[in-house]
Amino acid sequence: MSSKVLKIGQITDIHIGEDENLVQGIDVRKNFLTALNSESMKDIDLLVLSGDLANENAEPGAYRYIAEQLKGVKCPVCIIPGNHDSLDVMVKFFDMPVKNGKCYFRYDLEGRSMFFLDSAIGEVSRDQLDWLEEEVPKVDGEVILFMHHPPCFCGHKFMDLHYHLRNMVEVQQVLSKFKNLKHVFCGHYHSEHQMKFSHIHVHAAPP
């Protein structure tokens, strides 16, 4: 396992619209560019876009705009869909691996292994969990997991009640088996949360 410290940038829930019009009064394109070009994104080893790239209806113009901005990013980029995205549309603009109609994959960088899950429909499919159970034990060293929905409640009453991961218990049962999985990074809640279940720390990033 590499001793190099990886610097990973995560951008989530940018909700880009079809055109330059404001989204609910917010200049989301400007916000995206501000995040993309921020000081914290300098010299990163990997950029992760963790879902809800489009605003409401998987607008092609949103993905086209994002893809154009990503051309200037010098590091690798990993993308997973959120509940407002459409994988069928996204793959027309981004290099995203698709298996069984979902976007889930392992990405190795500098001796580190990162796993990415597709929770766009509000749950993690059984085939993804079976794949994790097969692949994670093969890794000698710590692994990192990215997904759109947090795999636990976050203390946000509205989101926890209405928009939580539907098969959360099933997902937790699988993830808890992996002693080399200590950190999960996600989005979806539009606010920052630090939670923990079992031995796993969950980091929900704000937009």
Regions found by a protein language model. Give the residues of each.
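Short low-complexity stretches enriched in small and charged residues
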Residues: 1-8, 32-39, 68-77, 100-104, ...
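N-terminal active-site segment of His-dependent metallophosphoesterases
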Residues: 1-65, 138, 154
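Active-site-proximal beta-strand elements of phosphoester/diester hydrolases
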Residues: 5-18, 111-121, 144-146, 200-206
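Structural beta-sheet core signal
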Residues: 10, 49, 79-82, 145, ...
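Active-site environment of divalent metal-dependent phosphoester hydrolases
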Residues: 16-20, 55-60, 83-90, 122-124, ...
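Short, flexible loop segments at the rims of nucleotide/cofactor-binding pockets, characterized by
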Residues: 23-28, 54-58, 93-95, 120-122, ...
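His/acidic metal-ligating clusters that form di-metal
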Residues: 35-47, 124-203
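Extended active-site neighborhood of metal-dependent phosphoesterases/phosphodiesterases
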Residues: 61-138, 164-180, 195-198, 206
